[in-house]
Amino acid sequence: MAPRGRKRKAEAAVVAVAEKREKLANGGEGMEEATVVIEHCTSURVYGRNAAALSQALRLEAPELPVKVNPTKPRRGSFEVTLLRPDGSSAELWTGIKKGPPRKLKFPEPQEVVEELKKYLS
């Protein structure tokens, strides 16, 4: 039997993902204002409903602040809210990745995130 060759597709995929993240990070440097990013898993509708409710609450409290939902492909089981600042830094307002089961522990109350956002903006 012939020797098996090394798989090169996995290495290329890792490099492509790293380049994509770097490009997104560099693209974020030119922002003029802060942005709220909500990343949620797409495997279940519960994540989407909670993300929609949270984005609506954020838009009501800070209408001048843009809110993006899943700008990139989300991680499995994730629910994160991040504030991207104009200087390129980011502040995590909520992460539910390590929380649960039960799944409801992954989702914050919208008011908690709004209060956290106000702390970072002031």
UniProtKB/Swiss-Prot annotation:
Keywords on record: Acetylation, Redox-active center, Selenocysteine
Cysteinyl-selenocysteine (Cys-Sec) cross-link site: C41-U44
Presence of the UniProt keyword Ribosomal protein in the record: no
One GO CC term, this protein: Golgi apparatus
Gene3D superfamilies reported in the protein's UniProt record: Glutaredoxin
GO molecular function terms noted in the UniProt entry: RNA binding
Residues bearing the modification N6-acetyllysine: K20
Recorded family membership: Belongs to the SelWTH family.
NCBIfam families, alphabetized: CXXU_selWTH (TIGR02174)
Protein name: Selenoprotein H
Gene coding for it: SELENOH
